Curated annotation (Swiss-Prot):
Name of protein: Uncharacterized protein in nifH2 3'region
InterPro entries: FAD/NAD-bd_sf (IPR036188)
Superkingdom per UniProt: Archaea
Xref: Pfam families: NAD_binding_8
Length: 102
């Protein structure tokens, strides 16, 4: 069966991959850049991440199951903890509303 997937972001690409592995003839249409909001750009000589900055539920989430079933290459996900960079210092991201308030 011929199938058109509209959108080459993470969901569209993973859907196309799964459909292709099931034997379908798949065409992905993307108006901008493949990867959607999950990509890096070179701006004034600096590599800047655009879009997704965290991927969760890697132990047994849907992304891991799709990659395990359909991908040729399984990325090595490393856990860095719940931190972000602000003014050259690492700041812990609060996990509860009470932590946000203090």
């Amino acid at each position: 069966m011929k199938i058109v997937v509209v959108g080459g972001g993470t969901s569209g690409l993973l859907s196309a991959l799964a459909l292709e592995k099931e034997g379908h003839d798949v065409l992905v249409l993307e108006k901008d850049k493949v990867g959607g909001l999950c990509r890096s750009e070179n701006i004034d000589g600096y590599t800047v991440d655009i879009g997704v900055h965290a991927i969760t539920m890697l132990n047994d989430g849907p992304l891991t199951r799709l990659l395990n079933n359909y991908a040729r290459y399984i990325p090595n996900f490393r856990e860095y903890g719940d931190y972000y960079v602000r003014t050259d210092k690492l700041q812990k991201i609060p996990v509860s509303m009470n932590e946000w308030m203090t």
